[in-house]
Amino acid sequence: MRLAGPLRIVVLVVSVGVTWIVVSILLGGPGSGFPRIQQLFTSPESSVTAAPRARKYKCGLPQPCPEEHLAFRVVSGAANVIGPKICLEDKMLMSSVKDNVGRGLNIALVNGVSGELIEARAFDMWAGDVNDLLKFIRPLHEGTLVFVASYDDPATKMNEETRKLFSELGSRNAKELAFRDSWVFVGAKGVQNKSPFEQHVKNSKHSNKYEGWPEALEMEGCIPRRSTAS
């Protein structure tokens, strides 16, 4: 028996109304008071708005450097396992990834005016020849920046001349550097005062972080460009 025309219309209207209510509940339309469908499958933790990540600047510094300053980060090696890093103006000058670091002293020479890398080398201070290091740092030109990061042992092969040259570059700690100490330093040829950029931790069995080695050091900052470099 077929439904009469008016009854058909009533059934159609009711069907449309029910469908609209169901869709509104699932999609959470305006004023529905129901959560949206995707929220039904989302954990409370994931719905929390993530805190904005702190912005990092060149070499990972938390603040930008002033004009006419160079951003840097120097990290010493950790024991004899993790190599050191030297970053300048967001460019990695020395690291294990670049395969240009080694046991001893890792040194990058930089033009203090332009900020361009002049040369980067590692010097073995346990079994190497200290004369190689002396030939590297003796002829530095005025205004050359010197970045140093230790790895494993920075001092066994050091002699008085080596310590004196680093002291003239602005180091306070070169004269007392010893076997397996951790050391990071930034100096320059021609400075009149001691550098503010230096950290040193003595190798001591009472305070070492690693078995046989002190903690790794990390130093960052902004270096003013030199006025002259020849």
Curated annotation (Swiss-Prot):
The keyword Secreted applies. InterPro entries: FAM3 (IPR039220), ILEI/PANDER_dom (IPR039477), ILEI_FAM3C (IPR039475). One of its GO terms (biological process) is antifungal humoral response. Transmembrane segments: none annotated. It is found in: Secreted. Disulfide bonds join C59-C87, C65-C222. In similar amounts in testis, pancreas, adrenal, placenta, brain, fetal brain, liver, kidney, skeletal muscle and heart. One of its GO terms (cellular component) is extracellular space. The keyword Endoplasmic reticulum does not apply. Residues 1-33 form the signal peptide. GO terms for molecular function: carbohydrate binding. Its main location: secreted. Residues 68-226 form the GG-type lectin domain. Keywords: Disulfide bond, Lectin, Secreted, Signal. CDD domains: ILEI_FAM3C. Belongs to the FAM3 family. May act as a defensin against invading fungal microorganisms. This is Protein FAM3A.
